[in-house]
């Protein structure tokens, strides 16, 4: 479930920093909706793509994670996108301030992703 007002979430669930991934996903989801994308969750085998967003003939894939703080997290977030055989843009969005883009997958800070004019 995604909420448009984080204040409601805080009132119901309280301020729990461990939920930061959920909060970041919610922010990205709302931004994609605001930009008129139709959003689904993707599946590649047993792995999940956080967002498959489509608008007309455009399509993007987005993985959201708080930080790429371990090799395990890096592999989890990038490997699912690397298995997608098409050439639509693929993003890993985090709070990190450094760029770990690889194999055509763009790693972006959430602030930069939200301020980006176009995703294609």
What label would you give each PLM region?
Residues 1-120:
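A cross-kingdom feature that marks ATP-driven nucleic-acid transaction machinery
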């Amino acid at each position: 479930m995604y909420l448009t007002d984080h204040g409601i979430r805080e009132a119901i669930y309280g301020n729990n920093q461990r939920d930061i991934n959920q909060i970041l996903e919610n922010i990205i989801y709302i931004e994609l909706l605001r930009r008129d994308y139709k959003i689904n969750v993707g599946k590649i085998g047993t792995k999940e793509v956080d967002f498959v967003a489509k608008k007309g003939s455009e399509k993007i894939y987005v993985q959201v994670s708080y930080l790429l703080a371990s090799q395990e997290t890096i592999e989890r977030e990038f490997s699912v996108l690397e298995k997608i055989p098409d050439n639509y843009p693929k993003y890993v969005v985090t709070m990190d301030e450094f760029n770990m883009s690889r194999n055509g997958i763009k790693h972006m800070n959430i602030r930069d992703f939200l301020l980006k004019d176009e995703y294609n």
